[in-house]
Amino acid sequence: MTNSPVCRAEHINHIGIAVKDIDSTLEFYKTMFGAISSGIEEIEDQGVKAALVRVGASQLEFIQPTDENGGVARFIESRGETVHHICFEVDDLQGKLDKLDNEGVRLIDKTPREGLSGMSGFLHPSSRAGILYVLVDRNTAKR
């Protein structure tokens, strides 16, 4: 990889956390931290229901599996309820995905897809330290 950033990020859009029970998780964060939820949305093609939650200037995404054989269910089974991904906000998402692909970074998505937080692209956890990274296009990002 080069010395200059291949994929300069504007900031972290959110941290995703895999949970078994999104309702009790949302209630806990509301009661303990004054978190404000965007509401729960079902994302059928990913086998999850999810909610973006604002805590001050920061944002979290809680993800509960709805498909017991899906990726998030397997993630919770192997790692428990914990941080699932880090989402960076970027300009020109497709351009960033192309650059990363050209640099040999293993991608889950070579083209953007609609996600809860906006048009997104996923980098495979094997690309760095077993962490799932998500890039969200700044122009479609929910804040």
Which functions belong to the PLM regions below?
Residues S38-G39, N69-R74:
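A short, acidic/glycine-rich surface segment
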Residues I36-E44, T111-E114:
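Conserved catalytic-core motifs of GNAT/GCN5-like acyltransferases
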Residues M1-S24, E81-V90, N139-R143:
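N-terminal beta-strand motif that seeds the catalytic metal site of vicinal oxygen chelate
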Residues I76-N102:
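Short, solvent-exposed interaction modules
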Residues D21-I36, D101-E103:
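Amphipathic alpha-helical segments
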Residues I43-Q59:
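C-terminal "cap" of GNAT-fold acetyltransferases
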Residues I12, V19, L26-Y29, V53, ...:
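Short, structured motif recognition centered on aromatic/hydrophobic residues
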Residues T2-R8, A51-L52, E61, F88, ...:
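Vicinal oxygen chelate
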